[in-house]
Amino acid sequence: MKLILCTVLSLGIAAVCFAAPPKSVIRWCTISSPEEKKCNNLRDLTQQERISLTCVQKATYLDCIKAIANNEADAISLDGGQAFEAGLAPYKLKPIAAEVYEHTEGSTTSYYAVAVVKKGTEFTVNDLQGKTSCHTGLGRSAGWNIPIGTLLHRGAIEWEGIESGSVEQAVAKFFSASCVPGATIEQKLCRQCKGDPKTKCARNAPYSGYSGAFHCLKDGKGDVAFVKHTTVNENAPDQKDEYELLCLDGSRQPVDNYKTCNWARVAAHAVVARDDNKVEDIWSFLSKAQSDFGVDTKSDFHLFGPPGKKDPVLKDLLFKDSAIMLKRVPSLMDSQLYLGFEYYSAIQSMRKDQLTPSPRENRIQWCAVGKDEKSKCDRWSVVSNGDVECTVVDETKDCIIKIMKGEADAVALDGGLVYTAGVCGLVPVMAERYDDESQCSKTDERPASYFAVAVARKDSNVNWNNLKGKKSCHTAVGRTAGWVIPMGLIHNRTGTCNFDEYFSEGCAPGSPPNSRLCQLCQGSGGIPPEKCVASSHEKYFGYTGALRCLVEKGDVAFIQHSTVEENTGGKNKADWAKNLQMDDFELLCTDGRRANVMDYRECNLAEVPTHAVVVRPEKANKIRDLLERQEKRFGVNGSEKSKFMMFESQNKDLLFKDLTKCLFKVREGTTYKEFLGDKFYTVISSLKTCNPSDILQMCSFLEGK
């Protein structure tokens, strides 16, 4: 910091003065003179703020994306297709704030893309070839990118890539005629538009936008209109019963059923920026700007809108006129997660020059956590003749993210993580059963369960009522028996979320490295040490790891009811376990008593659902069928179990729990809430308000959209 020597003459004292730190500057990228003018007005109004604004004008959105990537500008608000482009290499920009819009259902940062048809016309999504179509505009999300990308992805529209001609040419061959404002090169795509022949296909023509595309359908110029879920209610609320939605499963549904009958969720426009230390300054500036100049403020300057402008050149400057506020995007979010799997896939399908070959439909991409799981998964892949392929990540949350992105298909998770995966849009399809093999062939109405228990050494004086200040051992943060249940009970009793202050020290893999709950952890013993990581690289990870932590360092372990039995009496040959006996341990009951390890039905913390395989909803049936085939070969009674055993890994619980007798089918359509049960869902929902993980924050943001 610059020092200035200044003299206070009246007192005759020399003093050292500190100059004010230099102001941070945000460089906003604009793409037109009206937008630059609005930006400069905002700049002038915020000159006295801690963070100031400058404006950088470029010719196009892509020029702005390049400028931000090259550190010549800092931010711009983009629509979904542009945000897709910005997220690709070499730009790698990320969304940091989302525009929020007011709809009849309330404020939201997304909408649904739907296909609207007149009731009584009877055709389905599978009969669109040869029909006439109405679109909001070329390159627009609900009107073009999603419907055309989806039809390409499904193979309905045939297109071999850019070398075979443009996407517009392929669409013109698919529909008999269309109105696609902006598609002036392809005549058939303008044939159904109305107005002056010279301007009827312009981007601001009568049939452009949501209302225009709907009126194209209403006027009989099209058989189907690709719009957003609110369009019919906004344009013909009294006639909505005359229209229906085309669903991707081949059915039709009423207009109000858009949540279950849509082609994709479309994310709002997002402010994108480089993933660097400027992000906080950008959000601080935007937060202050919307506080001073947002909706319902008394300022003459409007950050958003105002809506209802007649001149299209003056519409949507800096932000959409319909925006009512900006909402911070969680830091874990990239453009692919922000846009969502369906929308991202639709756009990818329109960029075949950049696509990798599609994977075979009859195989599964399993997500393995850490090198031990990767090793087992690779052996499974070999004996499965490639029906199972493997991708490896460092932490379980990364599996959830990969499945969300379509980069993996499945992973088996414990109940606490099934909750997180469920918030992230995944569904349970198969669940592990640990006791009764005779039930394996059934599809359970009620999921199988196990008991979460607290275990202490028999020779200690620990009980449930004196745990505060003791040393604790947990399977991992966020897992059911090792975290959710015990911490949920402690949270209910104490009201505190400061769990690392409740115990003197502990090992809860996945905790912050400097937390008390990492102090007992051992790591891998190698380089890097990987201490306190939530994978098998940490010696005290998982059920067996938590028991080992109790044996070597801790006062209490939070584990599953069968863990002690599985690792005592010579069943675990490892040095730390080979001499252990079941009678060395006791259960801690919540009434303060202690009990024999086998009395878990009467002395437990909770009965909880077993681990489950989670997938994206559209993959559920295929993965369920494939896993059934794999289990017939490599399960407990598999025909080829001499080659490989799915449920065996020397007490390490790799990929599945070693105790698993079989995988049973979760009833089709079961939600994660139904699978977890009301009691467990209530406990975990309450607990998750305490310091929610970054992935839960991200998925809660998406779920709230």
Curated annotation (Swiss-Prot):
SUPFAM superfamilies cross-referenced by the UniProt entry: Periplasmic binding protein-like II
- What GO biological process terms does the UniProt entry carry, in alphabetical order? acute-phase response; antibacterial humoral response; antimicrobial humoral response; intracellular iron ion homeostasis; iron ion transmembrane transport; iron ion transport; response to lipopolysaccharide; response to xenobiotic stimulus
Kindly list every residue the record annotates as glycosylated: N492
Enumerate the GO terms in the molecular function aspect: ferric iron binding; iron ion binding
Q: Which InterPro entries match?
A: Transferrin (IPR016357), Transferrin-like_dom (IPR001156), Transferrin_Fe_BS (IPR018195)
**After translation, how is this protein modified?**
Different forms of hen transferrin are distinguished by their carbohydrate composition. Ovotransferrin and embryo serum transferrin but not adult serum transferrin, have bisecting N-acetylglucosamine. Transferrin secreted by embryo hepatocytes in primary culture is marked by the presence of (alpha1-6) fucosylation of the core N-acetylglucosamine. Serum transferrins also differ in the number of attached neuraminic acid residues. In both embryo forms, sialylation occurs on the Man (alpha 1-3)-linked antennae.
Span list, region Connecting region: 352-360
Specify which residues bind hydrogencarbonate 1 according to the UniProt entry for this protein: T136, R140, A142, G143
Q: Chief location of this protein?
A: secreted
Q: What does this protein do?
A: Transferrins are iron binding transport proteins which can bind two Fe(3+) ions in association with the binding of an anion, usually bicarbonate. Responsible for the transport of iron from sites of absorption and heme degradation to those of storage and utilization. There are two forms of hen transferrin, ovotransferrin, found in the ovoducts and, serum transferrin, secreted by the liver. Serum transferrin may also have a role in stimulating cell proliferation and is regulated by iron levels. Ovotransferrin has a bacteriostatic function and, is not controlled by iron levels.
Tell me what this protein is called: Ovotransferrin
